[in-house]
């Protein structure tokens, strides 16, 4: 089963359903704690190349109104591993959106200051008033057991598409995933397998894109490419330059879901194209 690689489309409750329901129905402004796990995208370690004591450091960041308290914590190696913000908001989602924007701006400043790679690996949210908690971290799937003997080698004309698909699956962010996966879809548009392709509910579920079901389910490949084109084109600025991404979490979540869908569709189509070229089984006793 394919698992979406991007974490921004989901928020998993960690408290009983009744507790979560009380928090969601309460729209009064109150304090939320939003913690962010931090990651080095080069080493993939959940730590940054910034020295911070395990006891933590207290900072103040510019907020929508007054400064926001930021507490950063180091791991056992003394490297920055988690940042926690206190946010006053009417819901967990609003608190996350505000905290994400504030921390991302601070993180970008550290990237420029240090020249080191930095990214948000996941987050957790607490509503102390209702003792409700949520978490969002990458899912780690189990190992697969391919049938190496039965595999058909890649034909030379499919190698460039497979390389693009590799870039999509290895992409460190949704924008890179969208650009690479979209290129695969366009490269397979005129292949025979394209005629049988349709976006299914299962694909939307795996991509975390069910909120786009009405506009995407049932689309053929040409229609899917057309639906993804505006999101793809927003990633490229005039003159063919790479465009800066929106710092709005909702916009990033939409991009992540559609990039996941493009990636998933590219995988299905590429695998189908390979299998159409598999030699027919030889009858028993054939030379």
Curated annotation (Swiss-Prot):
Annotated pathway, please?
Answer: One-carbon metabolism; methylamine degradation
Task: Name the domain of life.
Answer: Bacteria
| Stored InterPro entries | MauJ (IPR035383)
Q: What is this protein called?
A: Methylamine utilization protein MauJ
Query: Gene of origin?
Result: mauJ
């Amino acid at each position: 089963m394919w698992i979406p690689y991007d974490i921004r489309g989901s928020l998993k409750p960690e408290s009983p359903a009744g507790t979560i329901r009380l928090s969601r129905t309460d729209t009064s402004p109150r304090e939320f704690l939003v913690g962010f796990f931090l990651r080095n995208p080069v080493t993939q370690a959940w730590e940054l190349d910034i020295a911070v004591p395990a006891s933590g450091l207290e900072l103040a960041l510019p907020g929508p109104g007054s400064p926001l308290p930021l507490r950063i914590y180091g791991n056992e190696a003394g490297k920055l591993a988690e940042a926690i913000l206190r946010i006053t908001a009417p819901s967990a989602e609003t608190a996350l959106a505000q905290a994400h924007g504030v921390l991302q701006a601070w993180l970008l400043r550290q990237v420029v200051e240090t020249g080191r790679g930095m990214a948000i690996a996941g987050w957790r949210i607490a509503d102390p008033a209702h003792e409700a908690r949520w978490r969002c971290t990458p899912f780690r799937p189990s190992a697969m057991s391919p049938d190496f003997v039965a595999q058909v080698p890649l034909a030379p004309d499919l190698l460039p598409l497979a390389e693009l698909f590799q870039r999509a699956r290895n992409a460190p962010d949704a924008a890179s995933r969208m650009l690479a996966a979209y290129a695969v879809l366009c490269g397979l548009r005129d292949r025979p397998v394209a005629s049988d392709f349709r976006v299914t509910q299962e694909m939307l579920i795996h991509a975390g894109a069910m909120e786009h079901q009405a506009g995407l389910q049932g689309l053929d490949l040409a229609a899917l490419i057309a639906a993804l084109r505006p999101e793809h084109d927003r990633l490229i600025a005039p003159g063919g330059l790479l465009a800066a991404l929106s710092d709005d979490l909702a916009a990033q979540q939409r991009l992540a879901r559609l990039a996941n869908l493009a990636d998933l569709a590219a995988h299905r189509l590429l695998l189908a194209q390979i299998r159409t070229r598999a030699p027919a089984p030889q009858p028993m006793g054939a030379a």
